[in-house]
Amino acid sequence: VFLIMSGGIGVGNAGAICDEILRRHSGAFTVYILVGRNSDLKQTLEEKYAGNEHVRIVTFTKKVNVYMNAADVMISKPGGLTSTEAAVAQVPLVQLLVYTACEAPNIAFFSSHGLSERAENAADAAEKAVALVRDKARAEAMREAQRNTIAPNAADKIAERIVLS
């Protein structure tokens, strides 16, 4: 399962990334594209991939964690919350800096700590995602870095410290 996240408002080049995955990967697989609340993007992608058994378009959902837990790899912009959620879910992550310079520190941190791979464009993102799906050791090394770097219960620890102090 490939998961392409375009954010809550549905930005980025999800279609180009999907095209590259379809070109590079074969066999039994599904690409889920989460388009958020962007109805224009949803319509465009549904028309483009009508009849394609490998592609599913998903609008805004509160069940992102379910998609993350099912994914073999996720491609997303480097938003802080989404990136951290991916690391907590231990899903191999490819980050593509789409449009905001404020997310540049996120991609620098995640990629330098082995929590993600940085992609320069749609083709690069697809290439890295397919490589992570095919190379189980590479994907597991990223999961291990995620386990060792991101504390999934950090909020509980902070609350406990506040209550006990």
Residues of each region from the PLM?
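Donor-nucleotide binding loops and adjacent catalytic segments primarily
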Residues: 1-70, 104
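Short alpha-helical segment that forms part of, or immediately flanks, the ligand-binding pocket
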Residues: 65, 83-89, 108
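Acidic donor-binding loop of glycosyltransferase active sites
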Residues: 69-79
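A short alpha->beta transition loop at the rim of the catalytic pocket in nucleotide-sugar-dependent
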Residues: 71-72, 90-92
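Acidic, glycine-centered active-site loop in nucleotide-sugar glycosyltransferases
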Residues: 90, 105-115
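C-terminal "capping" alpha-helix adjacent to the active site of nucleotide-linked donor transferases
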Residues: 111-137
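A short, well-ordered alpha-helix in the C-terminal region of glycosyltransferases
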Residues: 138-152
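C-terminal alpha-helical cap of glycosyltransferases
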Residues: 151-165
